[in-house]
């Protein structure tokens, strides 16, 4: 086993040859490299599969031995400072490695078909392989310096993939927004790393924890400075995991290809922030107030993400806000000290959310043949509906992921979310009420997405659809090269329109949409022309990863179920995490009071079913047919209560549709303030600083010109004036010193 650990350093570097060879091939032999492009995709999957097998083997060894391994190379700079590089294999590393590789393999297989007609196919696979390398390097890092290096590489890859179709201004702006927002968190992370090095003199995790605990125990640190450094470290995780208030980049990141949305939201970028807090939890837990801050940020994000998902028309943006809310649950669990519950939910949510994103990609892929290659159309749930008849496999798997995220047993997220909800009662009743209420909201908005997508009739074939009249329709060509056809503000809303939160109000589509009675897709590269009037199911290359992730969603929750009756121990996750739990000095209690569990489970499932019922009543097609009946209309007659109810509903809709006005606040005050400061600085530089410099030059020029005209341009006059000035100076000098 020791020999196996010695070769674990190679894990991050196994996928690295693919992006290097693709880059070299495209530079030296572009035609030949493109002609064998599927070979490069196969190599990406093969190398990541090798990493997956290696990671699974290491995990089995850890479960059996309950140990961790660290190896460090020291780079001695001088006697006072040495920079160490190494790798750390512990339960957190092995869990993240398996998560990254399994989800990454499924996404790569899926992408082979999804990106088949894109000119950037090879570039996409190069970015994806480098993304996997960066994330594997992050989770195997043994010190804060390595963490920061791979942290930046993970960010770089995510920016490249978010802005993959960079010729579209909306994608380029989304990439820029993600970059700028994460710069704030990354700068805080760097300052926090340097601050803790100044306190402890070490970057290595084990040394850092030991030295810092001794300093705290002996009361030898400034708690205000330590708390500030901890907050700065946490700021990096807040930005990366899209926690309030640095969450604004996440919905715009949906401008990238759908497969990368699945990878970012399941196992890479947003998981990096949760990983960092989990890795540094032994540090945070001994600092007053920092754990409470983590839990507060988590519970705010839980509620905010759920409310922002309520009115989304874009299927990917709805799932993005769902990710934000679920990451808030994980952050809440870490803030409460529930290390096991947080990682359990990280695992179950990763597979469920990857399933949902790949399922949405399959739906978008089928809708593109009907409405065209425009994200504003193909991702708009107002143009969907009735897809259960056309994409039955995608419908079943999407329903599976939806039920899992709602917390319906026996699916994966039920087991992990229930643990967090139960722990929240012990931590804070207020937090518990918010967390449980948000569980109902989660069931509501997830089933809203499902019903708008799969139930009813296909709205794309009707001249009207339930969307916004002024929605900007951005065109994306087959190769991802077309730009924006029409510029429009993302958050523009016509308040004169009678829009209700739960209503299925119809709005006229533009002229091009009305003429699309028999839409078809023609691809010049194909040997034949394909004409489609209805969406069609994706092929097996895309369905296979969805099917596998569906199996994970069904069964992965079993690893954390403590079925240890009569002394048996079948809780795999607790045994797996035993070394990390011991490091946190927590008691690993694998036993479960099944009566207490069933009572809490009944409550959580009842709340979830209530949310599903409300969504079904408001969005299921039966409501559209019943609401015209006189009996139903008698309940919705205009009156003071009805008007008040409409105002409340419209207020909630505006809050959700306008992203809680946070983006508008940042745009007006932060962006506007910075631009105002820049304009003032520009004015001060041009008018004051340059004015002083130019003024000296102008004055010198005027004086010189005046002297020139006084002298008349004759050398004899200049000599006369010079001698006169010298004589006057000597006379004054003589008179002054002769009187002393």
Swiss-Prot record:
Protein name in UniProt: NAD(P)H-quinone oxidoreductase subunit 5, chloroplastic
Cross-referenced Gene3D superfamilies: 1.20.5.2700
Gene: ndhF
Keyword Plastid: yes
Pfam families: Proton_antipo_C, Proton_antipo_M, Proton_antipo_N
Membrane-spanning intervals of the chain: 9-29, 40-60, 89-109, 125-145, 147-167, 185-205, 219-239, 258-278, 286-306, 327-347, 354-374, 396-416, 425-445, 543-563, 602-622, 717-737
GO molecular-function terms, A-Z: NADH dehydrogenase (ubiquinone) activity; quinone binding
Main location: plastid
Compartment(s) of residence: Plastid, Chloroplast thylakoid membrane
Membrane topology annotation: Multi-pass membrane protein
């Amino acid at each position: 086993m020791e020999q196996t650990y010695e070769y674990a350093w190679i894990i991050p570097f196994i996928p690295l040859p693919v992006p290097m060879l693709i880059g070299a091939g495209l530079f030296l032999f572009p035609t030949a490299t493109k002609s064998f492009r599927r070979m490069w995709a196969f190599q990406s999957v093969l190398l990541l599969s090798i990493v997956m097998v290696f990671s699974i083997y290491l995990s089995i060894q850890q479960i059996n031995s309950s140990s961790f391994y660290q190896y460090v190379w020291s780079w001695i700079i001088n006697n006072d400072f040495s920079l160490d590089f190494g790798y750390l294999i512990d339960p957190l590393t092995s869990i993240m490695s398996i998560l990254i590789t399994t989800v990454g393999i499924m996404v790569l297989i899926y992408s082979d078909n999804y990106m088949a007609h894109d000119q950037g196919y090879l570039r996409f696979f190069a970015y994806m392989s480098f993304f996997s390398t960066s994330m594997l390097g992050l989770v195997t890092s043994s010190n804060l310096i390595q963490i920061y290096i791979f942290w930046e590489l993970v960010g770089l890859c995510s920016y490249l993939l978010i802005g993959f179709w960079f010729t579209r201004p909306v994608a380029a702006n989304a990439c820029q927004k993600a970059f700028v927002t994460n710069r704030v968190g990354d700068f805080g992370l760097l300052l926090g790393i340097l601050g803790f090095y100044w306190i402890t003199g070490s970057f290595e995790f084990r040394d850092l924890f030991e030295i810092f605990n001794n300093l705290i125990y002996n009361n030898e640190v400034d708690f205000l400075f330590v708390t500030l450094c901890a907050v700065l470290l946490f700021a990096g995780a807040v930005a990366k995991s899209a926690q309030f208030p640095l969450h604004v980049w996440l919905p715009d990141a949906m401008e990238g290809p759908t497969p990368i949305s699945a990878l970012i939201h399941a196992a890479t970028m947003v998981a990096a922030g949760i990983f960092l807090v989990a890795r540094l939890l032994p540090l945070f837990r001994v600092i007053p107030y920092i754990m409470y801050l983590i839990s507060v940020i988590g519970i705010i994000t839980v509620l905010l993400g759920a409310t922002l998902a309520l009115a989304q028309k874009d299927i990917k943006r709805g799932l993005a806000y769902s990710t934000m809310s679920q990451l808030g649950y994980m952050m809440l669990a870490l803030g409460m000290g529930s290390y096991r519950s947080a990682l359990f939910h990280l695992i179950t949510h990763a597979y469920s959310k990857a399933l949902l994103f790949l399922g949405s990609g399959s739906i978008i892929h089928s809708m593109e043949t009907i409405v065209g290659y425009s994200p504003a159309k193909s991702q708009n749930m107002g143009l969907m509906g009735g897809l259960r008849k056309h994409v039955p496999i995608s419908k079943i798997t999407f329903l599976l992921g939806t039920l899992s995220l709602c917390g319906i047993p026996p699916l994966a997220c039920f087991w992990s979310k229930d643990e967090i909800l139960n722990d929240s009662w012990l931590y804070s009743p207020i937090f518990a009420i918010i967390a449980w209420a948000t569980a109902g909201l989660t069931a509501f908005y997830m089933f809203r997405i499902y019903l708008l997508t799969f139930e009813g009739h296909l709205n794309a074939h009707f001249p009207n659809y339930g969307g916004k009249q002024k929605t900007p329709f951005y065109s994306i060509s087959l190769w991802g090269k077309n730009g924006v056809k029409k510029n429009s503000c993302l958050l523009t809303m016509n308040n004169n329109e009678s829009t209700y939160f739960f209503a299925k109000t119809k709005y006229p589509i533009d002229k091009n949409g009305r003429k699309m009675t028999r839409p078809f897709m023609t691809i010049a590269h194909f040997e034949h022309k394909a004409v489609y009037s209805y969406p069609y199911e994706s092929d097996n290359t895309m369905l296979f990863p969805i099917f596998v992730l569906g199996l994970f969603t069904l069964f992965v929750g079993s690893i954390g179920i403590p079925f240890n009756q009569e002394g048996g121990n079948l809780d795999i996750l607790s045994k797996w995490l035993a070394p990390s739990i011991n490091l946190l000095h927590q008691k690993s209690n694998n036993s479960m009071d099944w009566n207490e569990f069933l009572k809490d489970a009944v409550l959580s499932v009842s709340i979830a079913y209530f949310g599903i019922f409300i969504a079904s009543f408001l969005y299921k097609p039966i409501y559209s047919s019943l609401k015209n009946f006189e009996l139903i209309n008698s309940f919705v007659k205009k009156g003071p209560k009805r008007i008040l109810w409409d105002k409340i509903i419209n207020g909630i809709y505006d809050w959700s549709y306008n992203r809680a006005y946070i983006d508008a606040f940042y745009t007006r005050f932060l962006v506007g303030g910075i631009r105002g400061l820049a304009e003032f600085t520009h004015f001060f530089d041009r008018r004051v600083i340059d004015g002083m410099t130019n003024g000296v030059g102008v004055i010198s020029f005027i004086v010189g010109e005046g002297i020139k005209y006084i002298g008349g341009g004759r050398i004899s006059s200049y000599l006369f004036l010079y001698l006169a000035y010298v004589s006057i100076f000597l006379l004054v000098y003589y008179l002054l010193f002769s009187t002393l």
